Amino acid sequence: HSFPTRRSSDLVAQIGTKKISNIMGFYSIPDFMYNNRFSGEETILRFNEFVKKVEDKEKPDIIIIGVPEPILPLNKKHLFSFGIRAYEIYQAVDVDYCILNLLSGEYSDQFETEMKNVCKYRYNVDIDDFFVSNFSIVSNSLYSSELKYVYVQMNALPKSKNFFNADDLKDERWFNKIEARLKKYSMFEQF
């Protein structure tokens, strides 16, 4: 994909979900997020400190933070830490714009409403957009130790203006929407 060109003065810092994120030129979620060495409160405070250090070092216009696991368990075999990582991250930082990534599937207006409520009341974050990928879980891997994924043709997206997919990355509309929202926040930013 080609991404829209931005001003050379724009600086983005990214905290990725994989340990190998450093290879791609951005930060990785710290190891302490994955062990039980610290209490939940300590983990939240430490992650906040980590993000602050990134901010102080890079002085970015935007910090993109990937959440390393799904926000809800899939089944009894794949619990995804019950969304605890997401909870800790969302408590550690104030989110200006949140995009929830979804596997390929058919999504309704009711789904959008319910997921926004789950995120608002469980994680204290408002979902701005849903990004629907071209990947789906191979059904016979649901109960194996490792999930397998398959690339699928994109289903039609709901009529909601809050659903996007890879095709939307080919033009600037989605980026412009995000940029416009963030600019509104920056007008009222307090230091």
Task: Please report, for each region that a protein language model flagged, where it lies by residue.
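Short, surface-exposed amphipathic charged segments that create phosphate/polyanion-binding patches used
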Residues: 27-32, 142-151, 175-185
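Short, small-residue-biased leader/transition segments that mark boundaries at the very start
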Residues: 3-8
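P-loop NTPase switch/communication element
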Residues: 19-40
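Hydrophobic anchor at the start of a short beta-strand
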Residues: 9-13, 127
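Gly/Ser/Thr-rich loops at beta-strand to alpha-helix junctions
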Residues: 1-2, 18-21, 69-71, 106-107
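Conserved catalytic-core segment of NTP-binding enzymes
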Residues: 43-53, 62, 67-166, 174
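A structural signal for short, well-ordered beta-strand segments and their strand-loop junctions
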Residues: 12-16, 63-65
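NTP-binding/hydrolysis catalytic cores, primarily Walker-type P-loop NTPases
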Residues: 157-191
